[in-house]
Amino acid sequence: MDSNLRNLKDFFTLYNKVTELCFSRCVDNLSQRDLGGHEDLCVDRCVTKFARFNQNMMKVYVDVQTTINAKRMEEMEENARKAEQQQREQEKERLKEAAATAVLTPVQPPVAGNLSM
């Protein structure tokens, strides 16, 4: 729910910035209720320009983020392979040490006890 709320907040922040920017650039006369012809055209162009810019920037962001994510996945897979290889090598070393210890350690024969009943 927090991400949805954050997205909504970001949307309204962006909307307010576009509104403020285009209003300050395009509206010259506040004495009339309706926009004049040139004001209407200016606002339309301003909003269209901003929307296209935002869309192009998001395309670039998605492309770059996709590349970054692919590199991260490759790095994670490489690190996992290295860790697995290192674990195998450590296991081999432990087995070698265990085998060497088993060969060097004499086995005591069982002590004959009293078998009478």
Swiss-Prot record:
Keywords: Disulfide bond, Membrane, Metal-binding, Mitochondrion, Mitochondrion inner membrane, Protein transport, Translocation, Transport, Zinc. The keyword Protein transport applies. This is Mitochondrial import inner membrane translocase subunit Tim10B. One of its GO terms (molecular function) is unfolded protein binding. Component of the TIM22 complex, whose core is composed of Tim22, associated with peripheral protein Tim9b/Tim10b and the 70 kDa heterohexamer. In most cases, the 70 kDa complex is composed of TIMM9 and TIMM10. Residues 75-97 have a biased composition (Basic and acidic residues). Component of the TIM22 complex, a complex that mediates the import and insertion of multi-pass transmembrane proteins into the mitochondrial inner membrane. The TIM22 complex forms a twin-pore translocase that uses the membrane potential as the external driving force. In the TIM22 complex, it may act as a docking point for the soluble 70 kDa complex that guides the target proteins in transit through the aqueous mitochondrial intermembrane space. It comes from Drosophila melanogaster (Fruit fly). It is a peripheral membrane protein. SUPFAM superfamilies: Tim10-like.
